[in-house]
């Protein structure tokens, strides 16, 4: 099943916004990340202390509008390299926001939603997706694209490239548990992990 573009985009924007809001309510400030001058991001909102900066997810569209020279990020190169068409939900998911990992809770356990931190990270992500799909093809398994990691070692959450369904799979193995009919439905069912203490 395919999520409508607007529904999936809004689900991602809403969940990332509420993640930041929950962090502010719990800790009195936005999420923080260890600062790396060599790894700038439009998500970076300045110093929290000597080693950490505040961050917040940013819509990629707003970054592109702010810089007329910035081209919209796409997966055309990935599709060309693999000679396949990626499911629309996969492309929407990874081109909606720049963000750090967003921790979440599902009925099946804890997970971290993966996003690109900056343009270079987006390119690294594309390379990882190409590697993942090539592995799937070599193993003659259904082609999937991962978008989240779980608290269980080697267990990832992915989208079936043909159906758009969300599944759990062990790295190198066939998907073994269906979680949702679509990515938008899956994200809409997530809740925010109740963080006991702030990560440094």
Swiss-Prot record:
Q: Which keywords does this Swiss-Prot/TrEMBL entry list?
A: Cell inner membrane, Cell membrane, Membrane
GO CC terms on record? cytoplasmic side of plasma membrane
- Provide the membrane topology annotation: Peripheral membrane protein
Q: Does the keyword NADP apply?
A: no
Its main subcellular localisation, reduced to a broad class, is: membrane
Q: Where in the cell is it found?
A: Cell inner membrane
Q: Which Pfam families match?
A: Syd (PF07348)
InterPro entries membership: Syd, Syd_sf
Keyword Membrane among UniProt keywords = yes
Tell me the function of this protein: Interacts with the SecY protein in vivo. May bind preferentially to an uncomplexed state of SecY, thus functioning either as a chelating agent for excess SecY in the cell or as a regulatory factor that negatively controls the translocase function.
What family is reported? Belongs to the Syd family.
Protein name as catalogued = Protein Syd
């Amino acid at each position: 099943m395919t999520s409508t573009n607007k529904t999936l985009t809004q689900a991602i924007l809403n969940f990332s916004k509420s993640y930041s809001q929950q962090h502010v309510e719990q800790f009195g400030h936005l999420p923080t990340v260890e600062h790396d001058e060599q790894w700038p991001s439009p998500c970076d909102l300045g110093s929290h202390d000597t080693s950490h900066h505040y961050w917040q997810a940013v819509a990629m569209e707003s970054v592109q509008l702010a810089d007329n020279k910035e081209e919209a990020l796409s997966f055309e190169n990935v599709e060309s390299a693999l000679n396949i068409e990626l499911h629309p939900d996969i492309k929407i998911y990874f081109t909606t926001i720049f963000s750090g990992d967003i921790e979440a809770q599902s009925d099946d356990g804890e997970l971290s939603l993966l996003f690109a931190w900056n343009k270079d990270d987006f390119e690294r992500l594309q390379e990882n997706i190409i590697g993942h799909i090539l592995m799937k093809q070599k193993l003659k398994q259904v082609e999937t694209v991962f978008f989240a990691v779980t608290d269980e070692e080697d267990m990832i959450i992915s989208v079936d490239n043909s159906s758009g369904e969300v599944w759990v799979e062990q790295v190198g193995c066939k998907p073994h548990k269906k979680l949702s009919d679509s990515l938008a439905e899956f994200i809409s069912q997530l809740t925010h992990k109740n963080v006991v203490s702030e990560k440094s």
